[in-house]
Amino acid sequence: MRASEVMIADPIVVAAGATSSEVAALMRTKNISVVPVVDNPKDRRYLGTISDRDIVTRCVGLGHDPGDCAVQDHARTDTPVVKPETELKGYKLPKQLDPGDHHVRATIVVIDGDKRVLGFIPHPEEVPGIIIAP
């Protein structure tokens, strides 16, 4: 099974420069918890990924005002990325944990050769053949 077969095509993205408050409001409105961060909505070049939990732990939890936090400053840059043609059977996805955290952060962003976001796989642990590596 290829990434293009299971990804959410043309996912919601947020542009660098958006505030954590704006992203949190978008997440609430769209009922999503993770979103790719891109350079701008037109080009959609991937910069990182931000989750609702990241906003809490990397912005609010550190005493910052989410209205003043630029989302790219708190985005994760270690989210796995693949091409649409990537075969997922046997794909090893690293378990991403913060120190002292037991919450698995498993997501995959699908990009093209120019790093443009094409898709998003929000729950790869549910995709047959993907291995969550310890």
Per-region residue spans from a language model:
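Methionine-biased hydrophobic packing positions in alpha-helices, especially
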Residues: M1, M7, M27, A75, ...
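Short beta-to-alpha loop/turn elements within the nucleotide-binding domains of ABC transporters
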Residues: M1, A18, I50, C69, ...
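The conserved cystathionine-beta-synthase
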Residues: V13-I32, V38-D39, V81-R105, V110-D112, ...
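Regulatory sensory and allosteric helical modules in signal-transduction proteins
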Residues: T57-G61, T77-P84
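Short beta->alpha transition motifs characteristic of CBS
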Residues: I32, P36, R45-G61, H102-D112, ...
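Bateman (tandem CBS) regulatory domains
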Residues: M1-I12, D54, D68-T79
